[in-house]
């Protein structure tokens, strides 16, 4: 399966039990900041934004004072899982980022999608990739 198919079929799909509800944007990005696949709506990010995200995975709490920035949008960092998941909130939407051995899985949402639904979609694919050694 291509990386784009993972984004299209596993991240940008309808959320189980909620037809028509899906993430706003999604991507799979290598630890080096190279985009493996992304939705058409995924924001263009700056290298320093990706560097800050990777630093937070290695040094949990790094982004807490400044927030998580992606494509010029600032998200308030909320509880995640140190070294594994970063979660951010902005207004009625937010972001979930799951770290795998080689990549970061991004999901961005707006209402009516809930934070829990975004977490489920992103973390399920991230866990699968981890199981595959990726």
Swiss-Prot record:
<dbReference type="GO" id="GO:0005938">
    <property type="term" value="C:cell cortex"/>
</dbReference>
<comment type="similarity">
    <text>Belongs to the profilin family.</text>
</comment>
<dbReference type="InterPro" id="IPR005455">
    <property type="entry name" value="PFN_euk"/>
</dbReference>
<dbReference type="GO" id="GO:0003785">
    <property type="term" value="F:actin monomer binding"/>
</dbReference>
<protein>
    <recommendedName>
        <fullName>Profilin-3</fullName>
    </recommendedName>
</protein>
<keyword id="KW-0020">Allergen</keyword>
<keyword id="KW-0597">Phosphoprotein</keyword>
<dbReference type="InterPro" id="IPR036140">
    <property type="entry name" value="PFN_sf"/>
</dbReference>
<feature type="disulfide bond">
    <location>
        <begin position="13"/>
        <end position="118"/>
    </location>
</feature>
<comment type="function">
    <text>Binds to actin and affects the structure of the cytoskeleton. At high concentrations, profilin prevents the polymerization of actin, whereas it enhances it at low concentrations.</text>
</comment>
<keyword id="KW-0009">Actin-binding</keyword>
<dbReference type="InterPro" id="IPR027310">
    <property type="entry name" value="Profilin_CS"/>
</dbReference>
<feature type="short sequence motif" description="Involved in PIP2 interaction">
    <location>
        <begin position="84"/>
        <end position="100"/>
    </location>
</feature>
<dbReference type="Pfam" id="PF00235">
    <property type="entry name" value="Profilin"/>
</dbReference>
<dbReference type="GO" id="GO:0005856">
    <property type="term" value="C:cytoskeleton"/>
</dbReference>
<keyword id="KW-0206">Cytoskeleton</keyword>
<feature type="modified residue" description="Phosphothreonine">
    <location>
        <position position="114"/>
    </location>
</feature>
<keyword id="KW-0963">Cytoplasm</keyword>
<dbReference type="InterPro" id="IPR048278">
    <property type="entry name" value="PFN"/>
</dbReference>
<keyword id="KW-1015">Disulfide bond</keyword>
<comment type="subunit">
    <text>Occurs in many kinds of cells as a complex with monomeric actin in a 1:1 ratio.</text>
</comment>
